[in-house]
Amino acid sequence: MAIYLDFENHIKEIQNEIELALIRGDEDAKEILEKRLDKEVKSIYSNLTDFQKLQLARHPDRPYAMDYIDLILKDKYEVFGDRHYNDDKAIVCFIGKIDNIPVVVIGEEKGRGTKNKLLRNFGMPNPCGYRKALKMAKFAEKFNLPILMLVDTAGAYPGIGAEERGQSEAIAKNLQEFASLKVPTISVIIGEGGSGGALAIAVADKLAMMEYSIFSVISPEGCAAILWDDPSKTEVAIKAMKITPRDLKEAGLIDDIILEPSKGAHRDKFSAANTIKEYFLDALRTIQQDPHFLDNRYQKLMSLGSFVESMN
């Protein structure tokens, strides 16, 4: 059963009316209601607030990494373990083909349902997950395979065990190694891009965000709690943090924005998956045609960020 957010209530009402019209066999009413639905969707989704975009990024029906992998990756084979400690189910690694092109796909997976969410640790990777991702990146480099990374995490797991096993070192190592991989790398933020947990698989030749995804150094709730000690300031924090694709594109922190279906990826995962696939193929062609892509990646990374000194 579809889940509707509070600002989607009118969409839900019209959808229910369409279903009743179908039961009655009233095709005329169905056609009128569908036109009304399209108009309502365009009206709502063209005027979303940043807080509503955050809600969409976390929508329970939003496609996760495994949904996209199942739809776009053919002849796939999953690879497990980090060769150091364990297999982290919060990060999935596959070898397969996208349009007959052999690729490596690395994704952060949140899981659906209580049992699967626990298995995936709610998409919060441990150090062994990041080391598994690095193992696969080195495999891709050895066999000259492009890499597609799907980012979707609230952040790296903050538990004591993760810290004891070197969470910060694992993330830092990925940043260092992914920056110098000698194969094309393309990363797409499909939902939440939370802090270092997202960055660990977001260093790439091309970094894109889905239209209703977010990318931030901390959750807006965490920011509000730290700066104002007031959870009700979450919407203020969102505006100050500039976490939406549009803001990050303007700041030069991401390369591209991938448009979603009119009702969002959570309403049409097939179209969303196809859009990601086409973006990957286009980006891959662009990178492969550039003999200096490694130098360009380095220059892009070195140009990130700016600061202003004040004499006051």
From Swiss-Prot:
Matches recorded under InterPro entries: Acetyl_CoA_COase_a_su (IPR001095), ClpP/crotonase-like_dom_sf (IPR029045), COA_CT_C (IPR011763)
Compartment(s): Cytoplasm
Catalytic activity: N(6)-carboxybiotinyl-L-lysyl-[protein] + acetyl-CoA = N(6)-biotinyl-L-lysyl-[protein] + malonyl-CoA
Keywords: ATP-binding, Cytoplasm, Fatty acid biosynthesis, Fatty acid metabolism, Lipid biosynthesis, Lipid metabolism, Nucleotide-binding, Transferase
GO biological process entries: fatty acid biosynthetic process; malonyl-CoA biosynthetic process
PROSITE patterns for the chain: COA_CT_CTER
GO molecular function: acetyl-CoA carboxylase activity; ATP binding; carboxyl- or carbamoyltransferase activity
Span of domain CoA carboxyltransferase C-terminal: 36-286
Major place of residence: cytoplasm
Top-level taxon in the UniProt lineage: Bacteria
Enzyme Commission number: 2.1.3.15
Functional note: Component of the acetyl coenzyme A carboxylase (ACC) complex. First, biotin carboxylase catalyzes the carboxylation of biotin on its carrier protein (BCCP) and then the CO(2) group is transferred by the carboxyltransferase to acetyl-CoA to form malonyl-CoA.
PANTHER family, per the entry: ACETYL-COENZYME A CARBOXYLASE CARBOXYL TRANSFERASE SUBUNIT ALPHA (PTHR42853), ACETYL-COENZYME A CARBOXYLASE CARBOXYL TRANSFERASE SUBUNIT ALPHA, CHLOROPLASTIC (PTHR42853:SF3)
Oligomer status and interactors: Acetyl-CoA carboxylase is a heterohexamer composed of biotin carboxyl carrier protein (AccB), biotin carboxylase (AccC) and two subunits each of ACCase subunit alpha (AccA) and ACCase subunit beta (AccD).
Record's protein name: Acetyl-coenzyme A carboxylase carboxyl transferase subunit alpha
Originating species: Helicobacter pylori (strain G27)
